[in-house]
Regions:
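Amphipathic alpha-helical binding modules
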Residues: 61-107
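Short hydrophobic interaction/assembly module
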Residues: 45-70
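Short, solvent-exposed segments of well-ordered alpha helices
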Residues: 25-35, 49, 53, 76-79, ...
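Residue-level detector of well-ordered alpha-helical segments, enriched
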Residues: 3, 33, 51-54, 58, ...
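Short terminal alpha-helical segments
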Residues: 1-38
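Functionally constrained cores in energy, signaling, and assembly domains
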Residues: 4-5, 11-12, 44, 69, ...
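Short secondary-structure junctions and interdomain/linker hinges
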Residues: 14, 18, 44, 48, ...
Length: 107
């Protein structure tokens, strides 16, 4: 995978076909974009405090979109949310938790 762009920054801004772009702008759950973000984070040599804050923001936005999707009073619905969506979200959450703990990340 080429790292032409900063996927953390792209997701934070919801730009460049990032996972949060698809989730927020197109109301789509893009499995590949989420996988790309995870691999991008795993491949980083170091993570700055600013990047960690951005990843925390991304994680919160993902959870908010899921809450909105399941809220009967909210019109925002993810058009293609997989039935087993948690199987895709959980690896990202484990990765983020490992960053908080300062653990070595593995694929």
């Amino acid at each position: 995978m080429m790292h032409k762009s900063n996927l953390i920054e792209d997701n934070k801004r919801g730009e460049n076909q990032s996972f949060l772009y698809f989730l927020h702008e197109e109301k789509k759950f893009d499995v590949k974009a989420l996988d790309d973000l995870c691999h991008y984070i795993i491949e980083l040599d170091t993570i700055s405090l600013e990047q960690l804050r951005d990843i925390h923001y991304i994680e919160n936005q993902i959870l908010r979109h899921l809450v909105y999707h399941f809220d009967d009073n909210d019109l925002s619905k993810i058009s293609n949310l997989p039935f087993e969506y948690w199987e895709y979200i959980e690896p990202f959450e484990r990765l983020v938790a490992s960053l908080y703990e300062g653990e070595v990340k593995e694929e």
